[in-house]
Swiss-Prot record:
Subcellular location: Virion tegument; Host cytoplasm; Host nucleus
GO cellular component, one term: host cell cytoplasm
Transmembrane segments: none
Protein role: May facilitate the viral transport through neural circuits.
Membership in a protein family: Belongs to the alphaherpesvirinae HHV-1 UL21 protein family.
Keywords: Host cytoplasm, Host nucleus, Virion, Virion tegument
Protein name according to UniProt: Tegument protein UL21
Superkingdom of source: Viruses
Residue ranges, annotated region (Disordered): 261-280
Amino acid sequence: MELRVERVEKNYERRLAVRYHDETAGRIYVVYGGCIFSMRTVGRDMSITMFGYRLRSPVMCALVSTELLQNRRGRGEAAAEPSVGGAGSPGADYLFTHHLGSASGEAPEDLVNTFDVNVRGLVLSKLFVGFPVPDGIVLRLGEVDEGTGVLRILAKPRAVNSVTGFVYHLDSASLDLTQAELYEVPQFLAKDIEDLLRMGELRRSPLRLSIPRTPVIVTGNRGLSTITVPSSRGRGGDRRRRRRNVTKMAGHVQIKMFRDERDGQQTETDAGRAEEEARHISGWSGGDHCRVEPCEVSHLRVWKVVSLIEVALAVRKGPLSWLGLAHKNPTDNLRAVLKGEARDVCEKLGPWTEIMGKSVLRPGPEMIYATVNYLLELGGLQSKFCIMEDLCNKYAAKHNIDVPNEAPPSDEMALIEELAVSILQKAAVVCEVLRFAAKAESENIAAVRNVVAPKQYGAASELLVHETSFLLNSARGGAFLGPEDDGRAATTRPLFKRAMARTDKKVSAILACIYLESRPSRIVGTILGGEDLVRALEEARLRIVDPWDKDDISAALRVLDSIVNFRLA
């Protein structure tokens, strides 16, 4: 995992505080014990996102928890509630590498701004490298590239003898790269939290223009687990947040997966295994895995994923799962999150509803979600397609599925294109209706306010009112303006909340009509009363011919992106 930042330094309480700032995202990053803590510098959201390796071995977790508890008792402190950032005694599900450092006797000051964690103890070292190491080992979990301004958590952490420098083979099953959502300030940040946030206001030298601004990137061939750390607040705390056990990926990052070719110090065994795996995984293209290729390869990518996504996202349970004893596959949590997102987005009324009922392909929510994510990737928008593609490649390799690498079957590809065209055409019509409604509010509000929608769409429209309000607010802000609007500003006419709610309800019925009808242009034009609108809607629909043409589908993609973001919020 890596992200581009700018180093910020400040003397604080007789020590040098080093933080990393992403001005574009409005976030400050702190490195602590091999983990990266991310905080917002603007807005009211005070939640903290942490990226790092979580301990997976039950024996290891028990040993670390015991050491943390003994350390606290030795200092005369009471046992603490779960605390990811502090030196307390967290639950076994919330132990990270910085807890490992605390258990080995490291002070918080020694863990700040370092990706190296000392592991002391024969049993712990054996759990990591397979045999006891009397000298102790150092886990090298990441690095800071000062030349390019990149913080990087290594896809393959290294275990190094703390005396001789000998590099051991690290058991990859002992650690799990995880995103944790925290709702309490970690103890090591609590002392300088105000000063930390002020660091975002410091005057910095301009960022080098040659360095492209990129989101957080996850590298390697394993997924990113997500958890929510329960609050330690007692009665009166936020129970809703304590109940959450599935966390979505952070909204300020985009996850992309590709093989990490920077880790050149891996052992010969690791290199051989990686080469063997690369030969088996079809369609793997190294660091360019998430780059959109020419048309034929693009067709092949989406065909592979749509063909395999349902089985690839199936969470497999062991024979003893009914007893609660089965060991979960490390990627099962990722599969569950993606499967849940597919259902949250695509099982509801949307641009895909009609095609799901009539297509020969019989697409399920997973197929629809994969297709939508691929379209979003084509448009350069935030997408989960690369994660899905990685899971499908692994599934094909594991089950010896022969996937062609040249051209997909033409009949199957035609069905996928039909699916993509249908979704985009519906989204294009929705875009025109939203633009029409936003414009009417500022010029001729009766054009929307006085329409009478057919009663058969009433029940369906009730489910879309809040989503329609979100889409209309985006349209009022100019999100869906096209080139023909000639730079027209967003709606400036003051609108009362009750009046806007009436418009939202009317438009939600129109959107339900678009989603349910095969040829909605004529019906919607009749409802809104205008042949010019019928013509505009039909032109927008028929403009979508090639679903892989980024220029033709740009307006429809903005609508799809807004729908997905609302339903996953």
